[in-house]
C-alpha cells in the first residue's frame, strides 16, 4: 500500500487505511477469512467490529483470523460496545473484556460507544473510558450515533477535567440524507453544523452507510 493513502489518528502510532472493513454479516469462518485476506491484500488494515454483531461471532471470526495470521500489531481494530438497552457506564468494562477474550487480544486500538443514553451524564461515560485507557485496554475512543450537542458536551467536560476526549465519531455520513433512522437510535453527522464542528476540532469521522445502502446505484447495477 502507498504511504500517501494512509491516515493518522491522534493517539495511535499505527497508520490507517482509508477504507474500513465492517466485520458484521460474515456467514462463517471460511468466508470471513477469505474476505479479511482479500482486504489486507489490497492494503487494508482497519477492522470494525462490535459486541453485538452476529451474536459475538464477528469478534470471534476476527480473533481467529488475527491469531492464524499473527498480525495483531499490523492491523487496527475498532470495537464498539454499550449498545441499547445496555448503554450504561457499568456495561462498558464487562462487554469490552468479553470482546477482548473473543478477539484473543489484550487491547483495542479504537473503542466506540455504540449508542448514547440521554439519562446518563456525559461525565460518567468519559470517566469510565479514561479509566480503561489508563489501564491500556483501549488506545483511543469515540462515540457512535451521538448527537452534536452531547458529543460537544462530552468533550468540553473531558477538556475541563484534563482527560482524554472523544477523538472520533462514527455516525452516518453520506451525500444522501437519512430521512428515517436505519436502525433505532441512529444519528447522522452530515448536517452543516456537525461538519463544521468536526472540521474545526479535527475530529475524525468513521462513517457508516456512506453509500446509503446502494441508493446511488443505477437500477441495472
Regions found by a protein language model. Give the residues of each.
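Short, acidic/polar
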Residues: 27-39, 87-103, 152-156
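Active-site gating/metal-coordination segments in enzymes
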Residues: 87-114, 120, 170-172, 178-181
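Beta/alpha (TIM)-barrel catalytic core signal, keyed to glycine-rich beta->alpha loops juxtaposed to Asp/Glu
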Residues: 120-221
Amino acid at each position: 500500500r502507498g504511504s500517501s493513502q494512509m491516515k493518522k489518528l491522534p493517539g495511535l502510532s499505527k497508520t490507517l487505511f482509508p477504507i474500513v472493513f465492517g466485520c458484521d454479516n460474515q456467514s462463517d469462518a471460511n468466508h470471513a477469512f477469505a474476505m479479511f485476506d482479500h482486504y489486507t491484500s489490497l492494503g487494508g488494515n482497519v477492522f470494525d467490529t462490535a459486541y453485538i454483531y452476529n451474536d459475538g461471532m464477528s469478534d470471534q471470526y476476527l480473533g481467529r483470523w488475527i491469531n492464524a495470521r499473527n498480525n495483531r500489531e499490523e492491523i487496527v481494530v475498532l470495537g464498539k460496545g454499550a449498545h441499547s438497552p445496555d448503554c450504561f457506564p457499568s456495561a462498558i468494562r464487562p462487554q469490552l473484556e468479553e470482546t477482548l477474550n473473543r478477539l484473543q487480544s489484550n487491547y483495542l486500538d479504537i473503542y466506540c460507544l455504540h449508542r448514547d443514553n440521554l439519562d446518563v451524564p456525559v461525565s460518567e461515560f468519559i470517566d469510565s473510558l479514561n479509566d480503561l485507557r489508563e489501564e491500556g485496554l483501549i488506545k483511543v475512543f469515540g462515540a457512535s450515533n451521538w448527537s452534536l450537542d452531547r458529543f460537544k458536551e462530552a468533550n468540553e467536560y473531558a477538556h475541563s477535567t484534563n482527560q482524554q476526549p472523544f477523538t472520533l465519531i462514527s455516525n452516518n455520513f453520506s451525500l444522501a440524507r437519512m430521512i428515517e433512522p436505519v436502525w433505532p437510535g441512529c444519528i447522522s453527522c452530515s448536517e452543516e453544523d456537525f461538519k463544521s464542528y468536526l472540521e474545526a476540532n479535527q475530529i475524525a469521522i468513521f462513517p457508516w452507510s456512506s453509500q446509503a445502502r446502494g441508493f446511488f446505484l443505477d437500477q441495472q447495477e
